[in-house]
UniProtKB/Swiss-Prot annotation:
Any one Gene Ontology cellular component term annotated for this protein: membrane
Species assigned in the record: Xenopus laevis (African clawed frog)
Listed name of the protein: RING finger protein 145
Membrane topology: Multi-pass membrane protein
Region Disordered: start-end pairs: 589-608
Amino acid sequence: MGAKEKLEAMLNVALRVPSIMLLDVLYRWDVSSFFQQIQRSSLNKNPLFQYKYLALNMHYVGYILSVVLLTLPRQHLAKLYLYFVAALLLFAGHQISRDYVRSELESGYEGPMHLEPLSMNRFITALVGQLVVCTLCSCVMKTKQIWLFSAHMLPLLARLCLIPIETIVVINKFAMIFTGLEVLYFLASNLLVPFNLAKSAYRELAQVVEVYGLLALGMSLWNQLVVPVLFMVFWLVLFALQIYTYFSTRDQPTSRERLLFLFLTSIAECCSTPYSLLGLVFTVSFVALGVLTLCKFYLQGYRAFMNDPAMNRGMTEGVTLLILAVQTGLIELQVVHRAFLLSIILFIVVASILQSMLEIADPIVLALGASRDKSLWKHFRAVSLCLFLLVFPSYMAYMICQFFHMDFWLLIIISSSILTSLQVLGTLFVYVLFMIEEFRKEPVENVDDAIYYVNGTYRLLEFLVALCVVAYGVSETVFGEWTVMGSMIIFIHSYYNVWLRAQLGWKSFLLRRDAVNKIKSLPVSTKEQLEQHNDICSICYQDMNSAVITPCSHFFHPGCLKKWLYVQETCPLCHCQLKSLSQQAVAESGSSTNPVVEQSANNPPQEPLSAVAATTETLGTVPTCSALEQEPTMDIEPAESLVERRGELEVHVSQEEANSNSNEVLQRILTTGKVQPEDLNVKALPPESEVCAGI
């Protein structure tokens, strides 16, 4: 984005802030109480009181004008502000002319000005002021007809011509009337401009809704108005004005405790309307986004923005603040009560920010521990941030317990802080395990089990804390004050933080238990089998001192195969289904005998030949699995699909065809004593026990 685009974006926000401030002022202004005060006072004869109903209607007209100013396009909004500046300049010229005429009346001198130094000074000052006003007006209105704005110079010209003072007063009034007529002419000539703008805007909105829909229209207006930045700037202006007002009326220095109270009170003062509350929500969102961005920058440097240029974070904290403010009725409270409640809500927001920081830091710290990066600065940044996330939530929970009375919301804050500290502790423990494994020459076999136990312990504690929060919330709902919003929060908390976590943990436990049972059911290889196999583990590519043998005759480390079985229940090489002892017993009881084997058993060869024996021995050594099975691949179909394909073959190959096929091959081998290549293309089916089919 260039400098021009940045300037236009800043102007787009700055020009719309006054419309939000006008809406805020109109919301604060109670018209009914204002006129009641006038009625009780001696001003009930005031013309404003006589037209109070017109004033009430103008109050609503002010809302409409504010919305119009808020939604105007930037070019038209800039023109409107320029016209407003020109009107202010004309008013300044009128004031300069009126002050000059008044000072001349008070002096009573009507002679030549060069003979009276004070009169000459007054004339020069008024002349310079009028020239500046005329020049600025011509620049603002972008016209070279400077005489249009020089009507207020007529009293100066009259004084220069030695016209009497009484006549100069009349000339000044004429100049004022002439300027007013110019303004009225300008307004009349542009009277249809708002109507034309509204007509064109309605036409464009109708086209957008017809083509893209209401949602696209809302998103387009949201982006064009830059609503989050607009409300944030509006709230910051309010907050700065509140702080300035306080310090401008105080002469004594403020203590540290007083500054904290001033900070909370000023925030509470800036949350008395829905518009200021929205401003605080977006401000908190941007503050959270800035903190999380700094956190990621501290951990990864500029690489964080290269990998993740758009961080859509921070809205969670803002929405949390908005929900809590609406649920507790923050706007309707008094300033002191609002400041107290706002401090609790801000504690909840800070706890949410800390949890988001941990979500950013956790994968980065674990990846750094598992990698071979030996940069001490990177490790220091990761560990220091984890230590901060370990200590600060605990300190915050301690301070809450010290200064506040315990209730449901404070229990949620404390539980969130404790869980954050526990999760950081688990992350540091896993990081230490990774670093220990890094400095060891041989890998630690049970490091994954230790990591699982650490994470499982944290998840169990997290589940128990969530369960305690739900129990406390239910007890407060039953025996205390019942609210719909509180019940909804308890229900949502119970579903997401209790029920779903319990389901996920139980499913993980069942998968690990099933994997352990499968590993125990597999036979352990002997040293002779390992020497005969003479291969490495196909999962970790390390030498095997001990291994288990799958039903498809593949060798793996027990720990490596167990990790694989945590994810899926197939062989890593051939993707055959690996079943436990109970599953194998059920499968064997339901299996049928292969018809080719039965036929060979009923009709054995009567005259075994040496060539036939050699041939059968050679065929017996042919591996049942192809060479593609020597590396794990995910492109091979699992065993279920192989069984389905075998079923398709059984549909096309009948029992008699298979028997005649095998008999013809055996007779040809017995008569010729040789095996032809076409003899290997037999349509007989393999036995069911041979799960590893050819690929």
